[in-house]
């Protein structure tokens, strides 16, 4: 069934396509030193009796062995001739590869084309080939992780433009070795697909302004079509599949993997959509995996060495800020983490528009999760109104930068518009008074909005002479240190769980400052679990606050007190 033959013309065409590729995408040398065409072997391939999708994976016409290929349900490997065979129902309408380490693919804009659409009916065999290109040395590489982008209108696009300019400048400067980008879901906002309209196509138009970067995507709850009755579909089939059709067409599979350097990156769809198809008020979701996706994870991991670190991207977190199960079902998160029990795994998520990190031990399995703050912060609201982009727990809007050195990874959260060593903000309680009469004076006495404000801001309400200082270290995790000294004497930071005062002032106060009788909160404040409290000896002493991350990077503030509290004071 297999015949080898020589084809010089096809080899020349491959090299010409590579040249075009090199001038139009990643600013990296790919397939350097390609020899003159000499008629490299190409393959005529016939489908196996049971195959409905088959083909080859090659590099400049030469077969690549051991590349994992999937249809979204099952995974197989190419043989010594670079051939794969899939007995697929073509349910996903896709076939895709797990890009092997050391290789890359052509992009369409910023979207790496590791996937292709099927074209023939389910029972009809079709050939789909993949061409890979050698990448630069990926041993040391950078993954830029973007949580909750939410592009949906003109103001969000304008704010996003500032970030895009920053990324283009930094990635072009060479300070990030071999950079890639991965989103963590909610790139768009399903309601505005119809209201603006602004959909995934428009989002891609903005992302394509990133220069020379490949952007891998994770699906979020707001990247589903809300006008599809996913609730009924899930109840009857165990799948929320149809609402993802637009996503798959534009961004590819919802569960996929790629090998970069010594790291196996995997993105999984942990969103169970329960939209009823009626629009905005009928939306809903929860965390979970379908049985199809569980099986895909098992099969993908079966081809991954136990010695290779795995980084898993998903939208909805495993844990909330205090380490409890985010889904509020005790231990339910283990239905996800147990799939990875034989691997050295780090989980990344988003969804909450807040930033925190968790490490747990469960029956001998170490589970670490980085919940990445939202690039859009509070849906770009505080950025547009006050010039300070804030997540709902007060962390700055920004993105995570993963640095991989061989099989070692580290990460730091970078606030947009700042340098990489911006780890905390400090607040002097003596200069704060969040009384409702000052912060939301329009709210009628005893109104719902005034009560709401009083509950959120009670720790900061009224004058204070207790010399308390609060320090929000948003990305605090294992291996980080916080030290505070007052006139050379060490103070003992105490961890507390509070609402961040800057977010209350920049977002919640404005919402509560309303005379409306029928009032409800829009974007809400969430608890900051990485807040620390120290008590100084006087109102005018100077504190030296120092935070050092696990890689030795340091942010130190000499806090001269009294320190003014105002939104303007904290603009990055």
Outline where the language-model segments fall.
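C-terminal motif of bacterial Sec signal peptides marking the signal peptidase cleavage site
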Residues: 21-24
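Bacterial signal peptide processing site
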Residues: 26-28
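Metal-dependent phosphoesterase/phosphodiesterase active-site architecture
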Residues: 33-53, 109-124, 147-150, 167-168, ...
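N-terminal active-site segment of His-dependent metallophosphoesterases
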Residues: 43-52, 60, 102-195, 572
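Short, ordered, surface-exposed loop/turn motifs in non-cytosolic proteins
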Residues: 50-54, 59-73
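Conserved catalytic scaffold of divalent metal-dependent phosphoesterases
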Residues: 59, 128-136, 149-151, 246-325, ...
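Short, acidic Ser/Thr/Gly-rich low-complexity loop/linker segments typical of extracellular
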Residues: 65, 73-88
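Extended active-site neighborhood of metal-dependent phosphoesterases/phosphodiesterases
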Residues: 102-120, 192-304, 330-346, 357-405, ...
